[in-house]
Structure formats: C-alpha cells, structure tokens
C-alpha cells in the first residue's frame, strides 16, 4: 500500500519540502556479506538529497550536532547519513538524505531557528538518483544489523564531472572499479545528478577501517604506472573530480 507524504524540512540547509510516494521495501541482504557490485551502478530507483556544507568559523561542532539530529517532522527521520571531513575538499560535512522514489519541491517551508542560521558559511544542495534505501544502508554499513559494528568505517567521497562525450564511459568505469582483485572496500555506492551542483556522479566507497583504506591505497599505487590502469583511465574521461576522506557521525 502506497502513501503520499509531504516532507517539510529546514530550507537553509537544503532540506527542501518534498512530496514523495514510497511503497513497501524489499528484504535486506544477509548482514556482513561482501557486496558483489556497486549499489546504484545499475538500477537507480530512489531519490536522495545531497547537502555539502562548510561550517562558519568556530561553529563546526554545533553544526555537526545539528546535522546529525533527526528531524521529527520527517516521515522517515532516520533515513540519512552524515559524514565528516578528515582530508580532502573544502567542505566539512555531507548529509545524504533518502527521499523515496519520487520528490517534488514545494513553496512552503519551515523557518530556520534563529540560533541555527549562522552555523554554516556556505552549502550546496543536489538531488540525485541512487539505489534503494536497503541497498544504500547495506553498502554504507548503516543497516540495522551492521551500524553498531561499523563505527570505525572510513568513507571516501568523490564527485565527478565527465568530459564532453564521455559520460557513458565514466559511468561504466566508476561502476567497475570495486571489482578489482586488490580492492579493499566493504561497500560502494554510485549516484547520478538530477538537479543542483555542477557535478554528474557521486561515488562513496566504504572501508571497514583506516588500515583497510591504507592497504587499498598501497595496492592501487602500482596501478598508476599501467597505461590501462584506473588512474590513467579516469583521466581519459573526466573533466573534474574531488576525493575526500571522511568518518561517520550519524547514524
């Protein structure tokens, strides 16, 4: 049975009010199983909101605390993940919120509390399509069976803009990378831009630990010397990309 739900969220941080329709979910894969493929490399059934934000001077802790607090007005208040910058691009946090299979922006909104208005220096908001929430949570290690065991996970967050005429090649490559024999990731997600920022694909790779991340980097460096290796192939198809290492602060 489907229901129509209106989400009214905080406009300043891009949690725009949306109307969405969502149905019953499919059973989750077995917990702890190694993901066979990148979630979202093929079928993308659901809409997500991606919010990158830079904290105002001296407000990083307050902003993080606010971002990781579930919005009680949302019908799916726990359908989000918050990642915190450790090394890489200029943003401090990224919040990825699941909206369901459909979303529409409405004019009505909720006023931002006065004490929250100055927490962010800047932000960007982008709607993307991606895998089901079940696939997403499995890949990111935040499903009910895993999230208490994956608090030490490391997430590499990357976004890409393909060179003109190379969109399909880049998308294919991003979906293939986790299948490499020396890959140490525990889960991968690929999402595609619908509306918002100037990138086309968002990829998130999860590692169980910093040791696993380091091992993956050590394994991949020799590949940069190969003409057909991932390092060179990426630069055959990409106009722009950034990579940022993060940890998870919610859930």
Q: Where are each of the predicted segments found?
A:
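Short S/T/G/P-rich N-terminal loop/turn motif that feeds into the first structured element of a domain
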Residues: 23-251
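Short stretches within intrinsically disordered, low-complexity N-terminal or propeptide regions
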Residues: 11-13, 35
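Bacterial N-terminal signal peptides that target proteins for export
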Residues: 1-9, 18
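C-terminal segment of classical bacterial N-terminal signal peptides
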Residues: 14-22
